[in-house]
Regions:
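Internal hydrophobic alpha-helix adjacent to the cofactor/substrate pocket in enzyme cavities
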Residues: 44-47, 185-206
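Active-site flanking residues adjacent to catalytic metal/cofactor-binding acidic residues
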Residues: 36, 67, 165-166
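FAD-site-proximal beta/loop scaffold in flavoenzymes
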Residues: 1-17, 109, 117-196
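A Rossmann-like FAD-binding core segment of flavoenzymes
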Residues: 43-152, 156-158
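Glycine-rich dinucleotide-binding loop and its adjacent helix/turn
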Residues: 1-34, 41-48
Length: 206
């Protein structure tokens, strides 16, 4: 946030048009829940804060780019949620780039795998969350990003007395066939449910 505000202040006094625009370009990498949320918040800022607090920017505009390597946003959610998020962000003026990957960020330029470059001084990386690796939990117990496969009770696949919650786990359900999004609210809900289940397990032992 501080970096973004500093860049906006720089843009108001910058006399080089190319540098001025680079200061106003924001690139968000990762079209998951966090990337969509951040892009939405930035678009609100673009619409309601900039005209009021930074009138000196004149004809220059903040450009928000959301880059996702797969074919859709919110890959862990339903097709309807993905489509709605894309339409909402596009209506808010976000430039969505799908099926492209960032291969480098050098000298203030973002380089994509198709050769496209985007000059920016603000790069927000919210892609590629990888779970912490645990010894002896390997192979068929893991899925993409080394997330641990669990059932609806957060039990690790095939292990009745080991549980996993939050970013580290992968639980497939009809509404989330690719696992739940790796956000705080999911971890909180799983933690509360697991606490209740562990209490029930202990009660049954007595």
């Amino acid at each position: 946030r501080d970096t973004l505000l500093i860049n906006l202040e720089k843009a108001t006094t910058c006399t080089d048009p190319d540098e001025k625009q680079a200061l106003l370009n924001i690139v968000v990498v990762g079209g998951g829940a966090t990337g969509v949320e951040v892009s939405g918040a930035l678009s609100e800022m673009k619409r309601f804060v900039l005209p009021k607090d930074y009138p000196d920017l004149g004809n220059f505009h903040m450009n928000i780019y959301l880059i996702e390597g797969s074919s859709k946003l919110l890959g862990a959610m339903s097709p309807e949620a993905s489509s709605n998020a894309k339409r909402f962000l596009e209506d808010m003026g976000v430039n969505i780039i799908l099926q492209k990957r960032v291969v480098d960020y050098k000298d203030g330029d973002v380089f994509l795998d198709d050769g496209q470059t985007i000059p920016t001084r603000t790069l927000l990386w919210v892609s590629g969350v990888k779970a912490v690796h645990f010894d002896h939990i390997e192979g068929e117990l893991l899925t993409r990003g080394e997330r641990i496969i669990v059932n609806e009770c957060n039990q690790v696949k095939g292990l009745s007395n080991i549980f996993a919650i939050g970013d580290v786990c992968w639980m497939a359900e009809p509404d989330y066939p690719n696992g739940h999004p790796q956000v705080a609210q999911v971890a909180i809900q799983q933690g509360e449910l697991l606490a209740e289940n562990l209490q029930r397990i202990e009660a049954l032992k007595k």
